[in-house]
Amino acid sequence: MVEKRKIFTVLCACGIGFTSYTSCISAAAIDNDTLINNGHKINSSIITNSSQVSAVAKEMKPFPQQVNYSGILKPNHVSQESLNNAVKNYYNDWKKKYLKNDLSSLPGGYYVKGEITGNPDGFRPLGTSEGQGYGMIITVLMAGHDSNAQTIYDGLFKTARAFKSSINPNLMGWVVADDKKAQGHFDSATDGDLDIAYSLLLAHKQWGSSGKINYLKEAQNMITKGIKASNVTKNNGLNLGDWGDKSTFDTRPSDWMMSHLRAFYEFTGDKTWLNVIDNLYNTYTNFTNKYSPKTGLISDFVVKNPPQPAPKDFLDESKYTDSYYYNASRVPLRIVMDYAMYGEKRGKVISDKVATWIKSKTKGNPSKIVDGYKLDGTNIGDYPTAVYVSPFIAAGTTNSKNQEWVNSGWDWMKNKKESYFSDSYNLLTMLFLTGNWWKPIPDEKKIQSPINLEVQSELKEQD
């Protein structure tokens, strides 16, 4: 039997990153659907088989979209064109360093290369489901700048499906390795699957679903038969993977991708997702009221009910699983996006508290942010890294008093190059800060009817 995958770590060049893991007032958004940028052709060193390049659909939301979300700041000390160019340049470098399609065991399959630690079960790991999710979101949002974006995206999806989970085949196993035997060998990690499913909704809005891949159908299938069936717990929480117990309270806040979950509701009509969102916000509030009332920080892992920090060395992850470390550092971006895209006021309350604390802590200087804090705000780390800095900058976008903070943070972020984990999350945050992470809006005629299926039936592999 395959050993159940707990949590694995991403070894960064600078620091260690840990991977994978209501009703609202809609925020007004202004889309620029008419701006079409010249495509950027993929580096020839990345494409190894030109026959894999196929006809692609015209982008419906080409980069740059430069959306202006109501109540959300952008860096305003430079032009929108400058912001867009910084994203393009960062993406070009990211793609050259991390985007690969050299799998001899899966021709045409793309993956995002990232070093890991953990237990790859004797395989040589090249990437993860976490990286796959990051890459799929980034690629679909950069379509229009990158003329090969759909080919790349479809290749990333090919890999995600080939490396299906050993438990629920509608999800992705957490390891990518250049070995046929690795396909279907590993169980899942919740965060990677959430990003992958969400990216499919973006792909549906970017290219439509009438081509060789029905993105909408694949997304709805993954959302309902994969994530809902295996990751949503009986208490409306999110477990750590399809190996996790459905009765557990063990969860990882970096998996609490509120705007993803709200999109899942909009594209399926299943109110389960609203219940999950409400539960996660309540868990966050109850946790911070007791353990971090001054900072608003949350720990890498949360356990039990009422919620409390996981013990140190939880799941043999790190000695800081009870603190704001390389998992929790990603949380502020996931929270603020719910306010930006859907007007969720609970997201603003959390973002405002975190931003107020970190600005005070650093005296308004983003370069003074360090890589790790105890819940009371005491330093654990000693240097800034983008996977901490950029989400803290994103949290500051909800209040006009933070304009200088956002501007300074942008200047720090835009040229910061470190490693797969930090660079990927930095790029995702740059897309948000510049208005180039747009909201997927469903076609009402194609909303899936809510389906409540038995978990066992969902886990049967489809022919």
UniProtKB/Swiss-Prot annotation:
pH sensitivity of activity: Optimum pH is 5.2. Active from pH 4.5 to 6.5.
Propeptide intervals in chain numbering: 28-55
Active site (catalytic residues): 130, 191
Catalyzed reactions: Endohydrolysis of (1->4)-beta-D-glucosidic linkages in cellulose, lichenin and cereal beta-D-glucans
Swiss-Prot/TrEMBL keywords: Carbohydrate metabolism, Cellulose degradation, Glycosidase, Hydrolase, Polysaccharide degradation, Signal
Signal peptide range in chain numbering: 1-27
Lineage top rank: taxon: Bacteria
Keyword DNA repair: no
Protein name as catalogued: Endoglucanase
